[in-house]
Amino acid sequence: MGRYRESVCRLCRRENLKLFLKGDRCFSDKCAFDRRGYPPGEHGQLRPKFSGYGIQLREKQKVKRMYGLSEGQFRRVFAEADRRKGITGSTLLVLLESRLDNAVYRLGFVNSRTQGRQLIRHNHFLVNGKNVDIPSYVLSPGDVIEVREKSRNMQVIDESLAAVERRGVPQWLSLEKENKRGVVKNLPVREDITIPIQEQLIVELYSK
């Protein structure tokens, strides 16, 4: 994803949705979205009225920014979802949730997906006992994700796990907190994904 140089808190305000991009700060009273829940800029409190296309675009931007993907990466995931059997919008969200960078975040090993991508690329995690340094790696049921031995005393991981009860772990994953190990019990289904997204609008956008 191209480097975003502004405060990521502005993205939450722009999309009118808490995207949980700043880790623990998003759960504190310092959260910019909770304090100023309107778009950034001089005229931010006057929310614009969007056209049909604008509404579809904003919905795509929400999901793309939440999972930290570039436009090209997002299009590739959408193309894969469209190729598979089933409802394209739901499949899209399931594929995004099944990524390794999202799973280490959901398990509480990191406090944001961005941090998850950084640690994955630096070989701090194993999948089924093997090094995986690809954040977009798609997990399967039965996969075991664990912090590798040399990384088990990392402060950032310990601090994130200390707050996991507050965030919670989704039902499709199980966490062995003391062992710093997680298991994919099953693939997520749409009902497991509680983010307020209208994925059909994204399908309509890409169908034009």
UniProtKB/Swiss-Prot annotation:
Gene Ontology terms for molecular function: rRNA binding; structural constituent of ribosome
rRNA-binding among keywords: yes
GO biological process: ribosomal small subunit biogenesis; translation
Complex and partners: Part of the 30S ribosomal subunit. Contacts protein S5. The interaction surface between S4 and S5 is involved in control of translational fidelity.
Disulfide-linked positions: none
Family membership noted in the UniProt record: Belongs to the universal ribosomal protein uS4 family.
Coiled coil segments of this chain: none
Keywords, alphabetical: Ribonucleoprotein, Ribosomal protein, RNA-binding, rRNA-binding
Classification via Pfam families: Ribosomal_S4 (PF00163), S4 (PF01479)
The protein's name in its UniProt record: Small ribosomal subunit protein uS4
